[in-house]
Regions:
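Intrinsic-disorder-associated, low-complexity terminal segments enriched in Asp/Asn/His/Tyr and depleted
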Residues: 12-13, 22, 34, 45, ...
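N-terminal amphipathic/hydrophobic targeting modules at extreme N-termini
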Residues: 20, 31-32, 48-51, 56
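N-terminal Rossmann-like NAD(P)+-binding domain of SDR-like oxidoreductases, especially those catalyzing
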Residues: 65-252, 379, 388-391
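The catalytic Tyr-centered alpha-helix of NAD(P)H-dependent dehydrogenases
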Residues: 216-227, 251, 259, 263-267, ...
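C-terminal substrate-binding subdomain of Rossmann-fold SDR/epimerase-dehydratase oxidoreductases
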Residues: 253, 274-397
Length: 397
């Protein structure tokens, strides 16, 4: 079963009065023999190429290195689309993982493959809860802050929630990280931002030092980009004033299995419609341009950024730089899924409301992230569509 409801019932979730702290997972069981094996395997592979050395394990060194390997990663919004993939990836690597999520747009089912994992703690709660944030940061060696109000349809409908959800919890987390740093404990943090911060900048390709060009405040869709820009300003201010190790990533259309189309995401909407033989609804004339990157590529970049000290204190575009128009995307989805669906066009005012303004072209310059961590996306559009279609097909009875 996939996550995602229609936009209107979200209000119920947003208005939950007091968030519950509901921890699941067995949490603290460490698999020491696994770690020892991993460490000694690492030793065997080290040294000059082709030279195999027999090493006598040094118990002190092993326990020290095992302590280094036992990282506890906190993922806010870890039951969401990107967060759940990140949680799986970190568990596979041997991290302890704490997921905190209020299940507003994410859902527990996204974690079904790892819910019983002994190194996962799942906490149902909101990161606007001061005590909860303090407790979770106190247990973490690094933080991936992904929780936010996400999705064009949701943002157009719920602008108050967008602004509150995206600004206040980020400030709370940064403030707490600042206090911890003052007491001598620096915890690296990745902050998820978005290509929406560029607004409607008319450049063909956007690079990190470009201007942010937003529309009028009477148009609620800009509240998402502006709220994320405030997060970036805050993060960079904490870097400057308090020396916190924070890195900001601006995601450009991340897609893959488990993404829900319920909040306006285009690829899951198209794939679902194509597989069901329904029309694919393209907004406006379909000539607006986007770049789609697979979540597996994005996760690699996020982890590498937080683990690269030289990347700290900077903002990075993260995504694919291969442009495709939404109309061509719809055609490609129909072709890859062998669908007989038709394409229908819908105006923005019918899809959202009269005030809606879109961005015609959104293509990142990836030079900075390539220079910092050697990042290049590995999956092309066909691979990506197939991966999403396979997920839907496998869920159809
Ligand atoms: N998917 C994309 O293409 C994309 C593009 C740009 C930016 N981003 C950013 O990446 C991050 C993850 O996005 P996603 O696509 O996985 O969306 P998502 O909606 O699947 O994930 C967000 C998660 O945050 C949770 N959440 C929201 N408010 C919370 C709160 N106060 N406390 C606890 N949990 C809360 C939601 O329940 C959800 O599980 C977001 O910050 C988003 O702005 C995503």
């Amino acid at each position: 079963m996939r996550c995602g409801r229609q936009v209107s019932p979200l209000r119920d979730h947003f208005q939950k009065s007091s968030p519950s702290l509901n921890g699941r997972g067995n949490g603290r069981i460490l698999k020491l023999p696994d770690l020892t094996k991993r460490f000694t395997a690492g030793l065997r592979n080290s040294g000059s190429p082709g030279v195999r050395r027999r090493l006598r394990p040094d118990p002190f060194r092993i326990s020290h290195l095992m302590a280094c390997l036992m990282t506890t990663s906190l993922i806010t919004g870890g039951s969401g689309f990107i967060g759940s993939h990140l949680a799986e990836h970190l568990l596979r690597r041997g991290d302890d993982v704490i997921v905190v999520d209020d299940l507003s747009t994410g859902c527990q089912n996204n974690l079904s493959g790892i819910m019983e994992h002994p190194r996962l703690d799942f906490i149902e709660g909101s990161i606007d809860d001061v005590a909860l944030v303090a407790e979770l940061l106190g247990r973490s060696d690094r933080v991936f802050h992904l929780a936010a109000a996400v999705g064009v349809a949701l943002i157009a409908k719920e602008p108050i929630q967008t602004i509150e959800r995206n600004v206040y919890p980020t400030q709370l987390i940064l403030d707490r990280l600042g206090s911890m740093a003052q007491r001598g404990r620096q915890v690296p943090c990745f902050i998820a931002s978005t290509s929406e911060v560029y607004g409607k900048n008319p450049k063909d390709t956007w690079s990190e030092e470009d201007d942010l060009v937003f529309g009028a405040t009477t148009r609620p869709r800009w509240s998402y980009g502006v709220s994320k820009a405030i997060d970036e300003f805050l993060a960079l201010a904490y870097v400057k004033q308090q020396g916190l190790p924070i890195v900001v990533g601006r995601f450009f259309n991340v897609v893959g299995p488990r993404q829900t189309g319920a909040y306006g995401m285009v690829l899951p909407r198209f794939v679902e419609a194509a597989l069901a033989g329904r029309p694919l609804v393209v907004h406006d004339d379909g000539h607006q341009v986007r770049c789609f990157a697979h979540v597996d590529d994005i996760i690699q970049a996020v982890v590498k950024l937080i683990e690269t000290p030289a990347a700290s204190g900077r903002v990075y575009n993260i995504g694919s730089d291969q442009p495709v128009s939404i109309l061509d995307l719809a055609k490609r989805v129909i072709e890859r899924t062998n669908s007989s669906s038709e394409i229908q066009f819908q105006s923005y005012s019918d899809a959202y409301d009269q005030s809606f303004e879109d961005i015609r072209r959104r293509v990142p310059d990836l030079q900075r992230i390539h220079d910092a961590i050697g990042f290049r996306p590995t999956m092309n559009l066909n691979d990506i569509i197939d991966s999403v279609a396979n997920q839907y097909a496998s869920e159809t009875p």
